[in-house]
Structure formats: structure tokens, C-alpha cells
Curated annotation (Swiss-Prot):
Gamma subunit of the biotin-dependent malonate decarboxylase multienzyme complex (EC 7.2.4.4). The two subunits MADC and MADD are required for the transfer of the malonate carboxy group from the acyl-carrier protein (ACP) to the prosthetic group of the biotin carrier MADF. Required for the regeneration of ACP. The keyword Cell division does not apply. It holds the Pfam family MdcE. It catalyses: N(6)-biotinyl-L-lysyl-[protein] + malonyl-[ACP] = N(6)-carboxybiotinyl-L-lysyl-[protein] + acetyl-[ACP]. This is Malonyl-S-ACP:biotin-protein carboxyltransferase MADD. Residues 1-281 form the CoA carboxyltransferase C-terminal domain. The lineage of its organism: Bacteria, Pseudomonadati, Thermodesulfobacteriota, Desulfuromonadia, Desulfuromonadales. Signal peptide: none annotated. It comes from Malonomonas rubra.
Length: 292
């Protein structure tokens, strides 16, 4: 069995039409400086004979200006480069109808964001926030966005590189894929719970578990893919479904809102709806007294 963790470039080859990937080119735009954000792989490919923007992280690359950015970590420059790729995609298709806008495919295999001192001083949050905003704007502009988890989908890096997608797919747990906020050692520090207790909880509680099966239960993944060679057909299927739903005005069933409802249907997020209803009630009560 082929483990895809750390092989983002190979995943691109397995998913897109043969020899169609043109790195650092989107529409009429190109990324000239290869030394900026070397851990971010962006470009255009064909998938099912349609143009598609590809955004991935390169686990083999290292950013020499930011020593903590390696092994697929999304750093300051990588976040901005990925955001720029999305905006170039929007610009390239701005005159096209919604049903003709190219899909954006996110290949997800990242252990997190760049946690270095330089990144925090310069504003790592601005970089990741810019990328999240770009994807949200592309989604609203009509671009189908599919995230394909092939390895690690962890912490703030997955927040910006994946969770804004219309649909999230993942290779199943037999490929050693990991989806979680942080390792249990970090959870232990924050919650003050013993690591032994957290390890027990992680076996049954999707909040603490790292596998894609638990995230599927929460509605965070629309579909688990059981074979590497099945990624392409699954992605094409979801692109077609996204186009149909957007054309029918059913955007609310896609993206973060759609996954929230999906988690409730699967029995993994049963309190979400009740909490949202309580918050709405309190907000409108406050608004009626103070805002209107």
C-alpha cells in the first residue's frame, strides 16, 4: 500500500491529466521568483479536460529565510503565495459564468504553520488570514473548491489550507492520514488533563482523536477515499456536484456551514444547532433593546 504523506507532488501527478501541470502559471500570470515561498506549490493543470488551479505544500522544500518552514509547514511567504494563487484564479475567470469558473484543488499534507519568532513578529496570522479570505471569496465567486487530504491536516495550516473548501475529501486511515488541532501532549498542557486520560478519550471521542474516521463523524470530511487511484474520480465527482449545487442556489449546503449540518446528520455534532439557537436568541434580545 502506498502512503502519500510527504508526497504532494506525486499526488498532483496521480490526480490531474497526464503531463498537464504547469507550475507557477495561472491564467496570464506567473510567479517569477522561485525563492519566495518555496514550500508552496501553485499552478494550473487539466483535470477531466478542464482547467484547474492546483495549490499544495512541498514536504521536500525548505525556506532558507525562515528556518522553521520545512517538511510541508505553511510559513509566512507560503501563505501569501497561496492566497495570491487564488486571487490570480479569480482574476483569470472574472468574465466567465459561474458554471464555467475553474475549480481549485487543494492537496493537503501539512503539519502546521510556521511557529517561528520572525513569523509572529511579521504577522503569521495576516498571511493565513489572507489565504482563508481568498478561498472564501473564490468560493462565493463560483469556483468549486475541493480539498484532498493525503497526509497531515493539522492545526492552523489546515484552517487556511482546507477548511474553506466546498468539499473536503481524505484518504482513509489505512494511509496514516491525520486530521487534528494539535497533538495530545499540547492538549494536555492546555486542558491540564493527564496524557493517559486524553489517550483514552482519543479512542472514542472525535474531539481528541486524530484519524480521518473521527473527523468524518463530525462532518468535517464529506467522503473518505479508500484507494490512491480513486482520488481523481472522487474529486471529479465532487466538482460536478458542487457546480450543480451552486447553479441551484444551494451554496449553504457547501463549505463550513454545510459540514456543520452534515456533522449533526452523522450524529457527531448534536449540540451545535442548540448552541447556535441559544446564541441567536440572546443576540436578537440584546439587539432589540440596544441596537434598534
Amino acid at each position: 500500500m502506498e502512503i502519500m504523506m510527504g508526497q504532494g507532488r506525486l499526488a498532483i501527478e496521480k490526480i490531474v491529466d497526464p503531463e498537464s501541470f504547469k507550475e507557477n502559471t495561472i491564467g496570464e500570470s506567473s510567479f517569477e521568483d522561485n525563492e519566495v515561498g518555496p514550500g508552496a506549490v501553485v499552478g494550473t493543470a487539466q483535470i477531466g479536460d478542464q482547467d484547474c488551479t492546483i495549490i499544495a505544500s512541498d514536504a521536500m522544500a525548505m525556506n532558507e529565510r525562515f528556518p522553521v518552514v520545512y517538511a510541508g509547514i505553511i510559513g509566512l511567504e507560503e501563505g501569501y503565495k497561496m492566497a495570491m494563487a487564488v486571487y490570480k484564479t479569480i482574476e483569470a475567470d472574472k468574465e466567465k459564468k459561474g458554471t464555467e469558473k475553474r475549480p481549485i484543488l487543494l492537496i493537503v499534507d501539512t503539519p502546521g504553520n510556521g511557529p517561528g519568532k520572525q513569523e509572529e513578529i511579521f504577522g503569521m496570522n495576516k498571511s493565513t488570514g489572507a489565504y482563508q479570505l481568498a478561498l472564501a471569496e473564490a468560493r462565493k465567486a463560483g469556483h468549486p473548491i475541493v480539498a484532498m487530504v493525503i497526509g497531515r491536516a493539522i492545526s492552523g495550516a489546515f484552517l487556511c489550507h482546507g477548511l474553506q473548501a466546498d468539499r473536503i475529501l481524505s484518504l482513509s486511515s489505512k494511509f496514516e492520514t491525520m486530521i487534528h488541532v494539535m497533538p495530545l501532549t499540547s492538549v494536555s498542557v492546555i486542558t491540564k488533563l493527564d496524557i493517559e486520560r486524553l489517550e483514552e478519550l482519543s479512542k472514542t471521542n472525535p474531539v481528541f482523536a486524530a484519524g480521518p474516521d473521527f473527523f468524518y463523524q463530525l462532518g468535517g470530511v464529506e467522503e473518505l477515499v479508500e484507494e490512491v487511484d480513486g482520488m481523481r474520480s472522487c474529486i471529479l465527482k465532487h466538482i460536478a456536484e458542487i457546480r450543480e449545487m451552486k447553479a441551484a442556489g444551494e451554496e449553504a449546503r457547501l463549505g463550513p456551514w454545510g459540514r456543520g449540518a452534515l456533522g449533526e446528520q452523522r450524529g457527531g455534532r448534536m449540540i451545535r444547532g442548540k448552541v447556535m439557537a441559544m446564541m441567536d436568541k440572546q443576540f436578537f434580545a440584546f439587539a432589540e433593546q440596544n441596537l434598534y
